A protein has these predicted regions:
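A conserved active-site cap/scaffold subdomain adjacent to cofactor or substrate pockets
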Residues: 199-213, 217-268, 352-358, 362-368
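Intrinsically disordered, low-complexity domain-flanking/linker segments in eukaryotic proteins
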Residues: 217-257, 284-300, 417-464
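N-terminal mitochondrial targeting presequence
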Residues: 1-66
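Class II aminoacyl-tRNA synthetase-like tRNA-binding/catalytic domains
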Residues: 2, 26-29, 41-44, 63-204, ...
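Short amphipathic alpha-helical segments
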Residues: 101-109, 262-273, 462-470, 518-522
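N-terminal, Lys/Arg- and Ser/Thr-rich interaction peptides
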Residues: 69-90, 231-250, 396-397
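A carboxyl-terminal module marker
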Residues: 300, 308-444, 449-539
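Beta-rich nucleic-acid/ligand-interaction surfaces
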Residues: 124-150, 284-325, 489-496
Length: 539
């Protein structure tokens, strides 16, 4: 480096690196404090900044909170351990109970569904903290099921977690046997994607109806009663596509427990009941469209549904119900004949019945025309004032659209994980749609023996990058200001075999225009945390 006419001339590569190191350390020190940004560096300097400099600096200035020895949730204290991964932003939302909040769109949707099952007992206030045994073991989830992973589930400690589905209460409710029919609606928690359709806390509703063989003189008498109950159900004008037989090898009858006649009549009762519910929901959606001056479904063609064979861990045979809506088939729910071993675990071997599960957000977004799942958590009066459970359903009127602020982050994965596949989608994160009774869909297992409560959750995995971790970091730092996180490039260097990923993070406030400085500050903090936790090298 030499001086010429009062200016310092950088003449060698080493000097360039030292100069860039000095500048970026100053800038990033301020950036990590929230008052300046790496992106404010001169364009001529930014290319000189090496990922190693960014890594060292961010590691130095990224804040790292000490893990508490216990978590206080809903007035109770839970010890933490190496499995604990529940962030404060999730705990701060625990107990909001949007599904029972008066005049909230989720509550209105829940009530509309429950109205079609007037004799069912409704469980709407079950606690969200459950045991591993309740959430997984009691339902027959195998020890290596991906839903058990810390990358997918919020653990309070190794034996306790935030429920991932309403089915965590299923065995307990069946065992209590307070009513032949019930619904459960609740908030559920899963680590997963960041976009307009996914949120780490969402709401499920499940229902089930059973008949007690002990109340009848024979199986035939029970079948006759179910037939009478079926004939008493409301008839509807739906066009129904149901081309498959009730059971077949790909969708099997539970031959150890059910006769063909029992499965047939239970399936008929199930399908008619859920078709009636769908008519109610989509009729209201059609009315709301008409009131808003939009083209309604009924103007083009009658409402039609179709039954599609499916596989779920708690039912067999099983189906998904799809509705033809605005030019496309929309999956609404999963359902089936209850898996008899589940009833055995609930000490109800004499009962037979059906169950269904659905996502409340999915139906509420359709019913009210709500475009972004984050809105359900808004306390903005401009949102909440649009809904009134005492009045007909009306379409949501959006606020003025605030501009998006996209930012990209590109990084090399550490050498220890390069070449290994990135996990972008597992059964627990692929969708918020539940299987029957709210459970997580999975593939059939080659093992038919259910797991028992003494089977342990797999060992805590070593720290390695998982896409859900980036989603979690983004939500922890940016909260609801991050609208979308998407992988846009996955590159492996042909010679060095190092793997690079590039993600686009879109920032957008629902309530006001976000400044460039605010977006840059959030992005810098997310980048610093990514480097701190996983040792990635920013490109």
């Amino acid at each position: 480096m030499r001086e010429q006419q009062g200016f310092l001339l950088i003449t060698t590569a080493d000097e360039k690196l030292r100069w860039a190191d000095l500048v970026v350390r100053r800038m990033v020190k301020l950036s990590c404090g929230g008052s300046a940004s790496f992106w404010a560096l001169p364009a001529t300097i930014r290319p000189l900044v090496r990922s190693s400099t960014w890594t060292l600096t961010c590691r130095r200035y990224a804040s790292k909170e000490a893990s508490p020895s216990a978590l206080a949730i809903d007035g109770k204290s839970y010890p933490t351990d190496s499995w604990t991964n529940v962030p404060q932003n999730i705990l701060s939302q625990y107990g909001r109970k949007l599904h029972v909040q008066p005049n909230h769109p989720l509550s209105i949707t829940r009530q509309l569904i429950a109205s079609r099952f007037p004799h069912f007992k409704n469980y709407d206030a079950l606690p969200g903290v459950v045991t591993v045994e309740q959430n997984f073991d009691s339902l027959g989830f195998t020890p290596d099921h991906p839903g058990r992973n810390r990358t997918d589930t919020y653990y309070i400690n190794q034996s306790t977690l935030l429920r991932t589905h309403t089915s965590a209460h299923e065995v307990d409710v069946f065992r209590a046997n307070e009513s032949p029919g019930y619904t459960i609606s609740a908030d559920v928690y899963r680590r997963g994607a960041v976009d307009k359709s996914h949120y780490p806390i969402f709401h499920q509703m499940e229902g089930a109806l059973t008949w007690d063989h002990n109340a009848f003189s024979s199986k035939e008498a029970c079948i006759e009663q179910i037939t009478r109950d079926f004939e008493a159900l409301p008839k509807h004008p739906l066009v129904v596509e149901d081309p498959n037989p009730t059971y077949q090898p790909s969708n099997p009858l539970q031959t150890l427990y059910h006769s063909p006649e029992e499965a047939e009549i239970v399936a008929k009762h199930l399908k008619r009941s859920l078709e009636d519910m769908v008519v109610t929901i989509f009729t209201e959606a059609d009315k709301a469209l008409a009131a808003a001056g939009h083209t309604t479904q009924g103007q083009d063609e009658p409402l039609k549904v179709r039954w599609v064979e499916a596989f779920f861990p708690h039912t067999s045979p099983s189906w998904e119900l799809e509705v033809w809506w605005q030019g496309d088939w929309l999956e609404v729910l999963g359902c089936g004949v209850i898996d008899q071993p589940l009833l055995l675990r609930a000490d109800q071997p004499q009962r037979i019945g059906w169950a269904f599960g659905l996502g409340l957000e999915r139906l509420a977004m359709l019913l009210f025309g709500i475009p972004d799942i984050r809105l359900f958590w808004s306390t903005d009066p401009r949102f909440l004032s649009q809904f009134d459970e005492s009045k007909p359903i009306r379409r949501f009127q959006p606020f003025s659209k605030h501009p998006a602020a996209p930012r990209d982050v590109s990084f090399w994965l550490p050498a220890s994980t390069a070449g290994k596949p990135i996990i972008t989608n597992t059964p627990a994160t692929a969708s918020t749609a539940p299987s029957p009774a709210g459970g997580q869909p999975t593939e059939p297992s080659t093992t038919t023996t259910p797991t028992t409560s003494d089977q342990q959750t797999p060992e805590s995995p070593a720290s390695a990058f998982h896409e859900n971790d980036l989603m979690e970091i983004a939500r922890n730092i940016a909260g609801d200001s991050v609208e979308d996180v998407k992988l846009i490039d996955d590159f492996t260097h042909p010679k060095k075999q190092r793997r690079s990923l590039c993600y686009r993070l879109t920032y957008r406030s629902l309530e006001r225009t976000m400044t460039t400085e605010e977006a840059n500050s959030l992005h810098d903090r997310i980048t610093a945390e990514l480097v701190e936790r996983f040792g990635v090298e920013i490109r």
